[in-house]
Amino acid sequence: MEQPNTKPVAPATSRNAALFERAQKLIPGGVNSPVRAFKAVGGTPRFIQRAQGAYFWDADGQRYIDYIGSWGPMILGHGHPAVVEAVQKAVLEGFSYGAPTEREVELAEEIVKLVPSIEMVRLVSSGTEATMSVIRLARGATGRSKIIKFEGCYHGHSDALLVKAGSGLATFGSPTSAGVPPEVVQHTLVLEYNHIAQLEEAFSLHGRDIACLMIEPIAGNMNFVRASVPFIKRCRELCTQYDALLVFDEVMTGFRVALGGAQSVYAQSIPGFKPDITALGKVIGGGMPMAAFGGTRAVMEHLAPLGGVYQAGTLSGNPVATACGLATLREIQKPGFYDALGARTRSLVEGLTHAANQAGVPFCGDSEGGMFGFFLLGTLPQNYPQVMKTDSPTFNRFFHAMLDSGVYYAPALYEAGFVSAAHTAEDIEATVEAATRFFAGR
């Protein structure tokens, strides 16, 4: 196996540094998505030149074991032959038509087959577009205005969902981004994740005005925090009782943690469990701009052109993106795929935990399928305030030590990590060895 570089390039000769300097003159912050700027951890972002399998190479020619996987989509690894072949064939047939294609129908059929809660599905181009459209759909289908979200859950950057929790119970939201007028989020209730009593109180106060409850079943922007089974069960019960729609945001977890998504994991403990609407993204595009939302036929038929809820997109169902997504979904259905992926991911988390504990460093981790997270804490957190107690300075040092060893984790404390089918036992071993060196010498 080719070994990663372990000697950082001096800033004076680094192409990464030169590219970042050029980028900052033209692109706000030098990046096109804030987390890529390394602002949380410090240092110079790596500008990626190419990727293959479980690795990518930066502008200085250094190779890294990749645990961000384009923030989730690359479940097969980079450049999987079946996906590359499908995309090459699609490109030769045309980039975009602005008209329906057979592959749109085929991708919809695959999604409906694999996710039992989805009877109809609409394809869009990003996770933000999916969740934004879901909010409009839920309000249109119910005739209600209020929505519930949870502190620490990220549902994209649409105005109504960029909300932080205020103090006290079920506080009406205030924006967490400049440029979002307060009146836009006045109908957004923000509750504490995994807090059943607060959830019950919110429905008691506002139940008949709530259009939907939106939740990340595994919150990947709190690093990796699971909603407890009793909490999800109560979410379902209260939504049913008050005729509100239960929305699972599975943009990150869909097809990443299990073939049927996180909802299939909860259905193992809650008989008959289904959300009303599901938002999907990342894996269904295989690395191309692709997302979707789907649910019961009764709800989805409120969408135009059947109903009065308008949603549209020039590139929705793009023929190249659907080819990439279809090829990916067909690969992950092969026998044993998720068993092997889950075992490899668990071995990584177990190895990191052992390395830290041997050095007396508080550390805990969790995983499901090919998604994982870890905290510099003694016990797994259950909500955002607990996540905030993790040791940020130590994480930043850990991040840079691993980066210098050729291991690329998310450059932020609150982001989940991802393992692909291309990661090998040797990759995991090299990663754990690098972590062991850091913890022993901290």
UniProtKB/Swiss-Prot annotation:
Its EC number is 5.4.3.8. SUPFAM superfamilies: PLP-dependent transferases. Homodimer. Belongs to the class-III pyridoxal-phosphate-dependent aminotransferase family. HemL subfamily. The modification N6-(pyridoxal phosphate)lysine is found at K282. PANTHER family: GLUTAMATE-1-SEMIALDEHYDE 2,1-AMINOMUTASE, GLUTAMATE-1-SEMIALDEHYDE 2,1-AMINOMUTASE 1, CHLOROPLASTIC-RELATED. One of its GO terms (molecular function) is glutamate-1-semialdehyde 2,1-aminomutase activity. It catalyses: (S)-4-amino-5-oxopentanoate = 5-aminolevulinate. Pfam families: Aminotran_3. This is Glutamate-1-semialdehyde 2,1-aminomutase. The keyword Isomerase applies. Its cofactor is pyridoxal 5'-phosphate. Gene3D superfamilies: Aspartate Aminotransferase, domain 1, Type I PLP-dependent aspartate aminotransferase-like (Major domain). It is found in: Cytoplasm. It comes from Polaromonas naphthalenivorans (strain CJ2). HAMAP family: HemL_aminotrans_3 (MF_00375). Keywords: Cytoplasm, Isomerase, Porphyrin biosynthesis, Pyridoxal phosphate. Pathway: Porphyrin-containing compound metabolism; protoporphyrin-IX biosynthesis; 5-aminolevulinate from L-glutamyl-tRNA(Glu): step 2/2. One of its GO terms (biological process) is protoporphyrinogen IX biosynthetic process. GO terms for cellular component: cytoplasm.
